[in-house]
Amino acid sequence: MNATQEQLKIKLEQALVAAFGDEYAGVDPILVSASNPKFGDYQANVALSLSKKLGQQPRAIASAIVEKLDVSEICEKPEIAGPGFINLKLKTAYLEAQLNTIQADTRLGVPTAKHPQREIVDFSSPNIAKEMHVGHLRSTIIGDSIARILEFRGHDVLRLNHVGDWGTQFGMLITYLREVSPEALTTANALDIGDLVSFYRQAKQRFDADEAFQETARQEVVRLQAGAADTLHAWKLLCEQSRQEFQVIYDLLDVKLTERGESFYNPLLPTVVENLEKSGLLVENQGAKCVFLDGFTNREGEPLPLIVQKSDGGYNYATTDLAALRYRIQKDEAKRIIYITDAGQANHFAQFFQVARKAGWIPDDVELVHVPFGLVLGEDGKKFKTRSGDTVRLRDLLDEAISRAHADVEVRLKAEEREETAEFIDKVAEVVGISAVKYADLSQNRTSNYIFSYDKMLDLKGNTAPYMLYAYARIQGISRKGEINFADLGDNAKVILQHETEFALAKYLLQLGEVISTVEEDLSPNRLCEYLYELSKRFNAFYDRNQGVQVLSAEEPLRTSRLVLCDLTARTLKLGLSLLGIQVLERM
């Protein structure tokens, strides 16, 4: 809800009490944006909901409310429509004043949260000794965008990368490398990441087929857990090599993360089991220690357990996640913990959240949220793979997007008979390519699967990053053409609204705060994408040479007013795109 809606809501609540008495204090006036501009800007539907309780016709109730409603500073005279809708149309002077206010505000009228708090966003989380693949794309960019929005709202955000850096796979890999490439266990970067991944696959095949190898690998894990110097050194080298590779991707995506892998919580695992035992939740089942869950059953209808200690005394992902959760509440003092993973892990989160609640670890003021997302599909509608059937490496995917953007830029420059430096072309291609990949993902409802298409995401038309980047660059072109520095327009530059496209643009500019507040609450960045796309369309209609208005050639004070609208649009696009992790371009 934006500031204008907040004011109108309060005034409607006051009118309700004035019309029908104190017992109606706090009744929701059901104020919504009007579905059709011809009915005004907002519509209050409370009269229909009170008809039965008051024993009156909705129109009579609406009339009584309107009689006590004072919105003269904000709206034209309220109108009652249909069965009892109260329609409210914003005054032109009010709209102009609001725009002048946000013009002078670096935050464009978006307030910080009333109650800022410590929030943890757990995202990306690749595995050591494996390359980041297309499956990590969604978690990484959705998590980054959510973190950016929460930070902008003033929350203290801890961005955590829960990397898979511990467990059986290291015993397996170290055992295999001792045989085939021992120098990789003593010398930094003796292998490149591709070789490391290949050796990991070979080690897994040996582990699955060779019992003697299995036993040696398990002993290596025991040595790692005991802190044996040579094994620990090898583990650190492998982790550091993967970390360097991950950082190349994070730098390309402009993503900031604090790494805190599974190994961090390893010393805390016995305490988790001990605490659950003391609370009476642990049950021994076939030698394993587990907690039986409410609402989870197997095919036979029997309760499903969550295993927290295996029969051999080892731990698993659930134990680590429980330890991490306790630490984040007790030590990090988080009030909301947000996990960004694929929808396939929904049951896992529901299960260990339930165990933590049963154990009494979750205070009333702490919220746990799993943010699930769907799959990335190929254009054949199946899981996105390479032609050979392998998982798509994230680095390859990003490089391909940049390469295609590079080719598009060169074709466009040739068509326009424009010459630019190689440095300019490379910069534009990288920004457009990375932005296109990010925006194509973020603009989807995150719970849905989506089809990955380079052609669609790089299109200059439609709901794409290039369309948005072009709208921003177009406004900067107006500035250059008119030799105007928008920052020099000054506090005396006033907005004057006359043309219908100006009104449509102005009203939409004032909705930014409402949109960001919604994303903060429901953690769906696609809502911000939708807003920016609609804003770009409204700007293009405003600036259209046939249907829109003249800007640079207009007479004063309209010229300055329209330049302010251009500036506000550019600043809103830049801010909104930055919250999606997308960089703008002054020229394209």
From Swiss-Prot:
<dbReference type="GO" id="GO:0005524">
    <property type="term" value="F:ATP binding"/>
</dbReference>
<dbReference type="GO" id="GO:0004814">
    <property type="term" value="F:arginine-tRNA ligase activity"/>
</dbReference>
<keyword id="KW-0648">Protein biosynthesis</keyword>
<dbReference type="GO" id="GO:0005737">
    <property type="term" value="C:cytoplasm"/>
</dbReference>
<dbReference type="Pfam" id="PF00750">
    <property type="entry name" value="tRNA-synt_1d"/>
</dbReference>
<dbReference type="InterPro" id="IPR001278">
    <property type="entry name" value="Arg-tRNA-ligase"/>
</dbReference>
<comment type="subunit">
    <text>Monomer.</text>
</comment>
<keyword id="KW-0547">Nucleotide-binding</keyword>
<dbReference type="Pfam" id="PF05746">
    <property type="entry name" value="DALR_1"/>
</dbReference>
<dbReference type="InterPro" id="IPR014729">
    <property type="entry name" value="Rossmann-like_a/b/a_fold"/>
</dbReference>
<dbReference type="Pfam" id="PF03485">
    <property type="entry name" value="Arg_tRNA_synt_N"/>
</dbReference>
<dbReference type="InterPro" id="IPR001412">
    <property type="entry name" value="aa-tRNA-synth_I_CS"/>
</dbReference>
<dbReference type="InterPro" id="IPR035684">
    <property type="entry name" value="ArgRS_core"/>
</dbReference>
<dbReference type="InterPro" id="IPR008909">
    <property type="entry name" value="DALR_anticod-bd"/>
</dbReference>
<keyword id="KW-0436">Ligase</keyword>
<dbReference type="InterPro" id="IPR009080">
    <property type="entry name" value="tRNAsynth_Ia_anticodon-bd"/>
</dbReference>
<dbReference type="InterPro" id="IPR005148">
    <property type="entry name" value="Arg-tRNA-synth_N"/>
</dbReference>
<protein>
    <recommendedName>
        <fullName>Arginine--tRNA ligase</fullName>
        <ecNumber>6.1.1.19</ecNumber>
    </recommendedName>
</protein>
<keyword id="KW-0067">ATP-binding</keyword>
<dbReference type="GO" id="GO:0006420">
    <property type="term" value="P:arginyl-tRNA aminoacylation"/>
</dbReference>
<keyword id="KW-0030">Aminoacyl-tRNA synthetase</keyword>
<keyword id="KW-0963">Cytoplasm</keyword>
<comment type="similarity">
    <text>Belongs to the class-I aminoacyl-tRNA synthetase family.</text>
</comment>
<feature type="short sequence motif" description="'HIGH' region">
    <location>
        <begin position="126"/>
        <end position="136"/>
    </location>
</feature>
<dbReference type="InterPro" id="IPR036695">
    <property type="entry name" value="Arg-tRNA-synth_N_sf"/>
</dbReference>
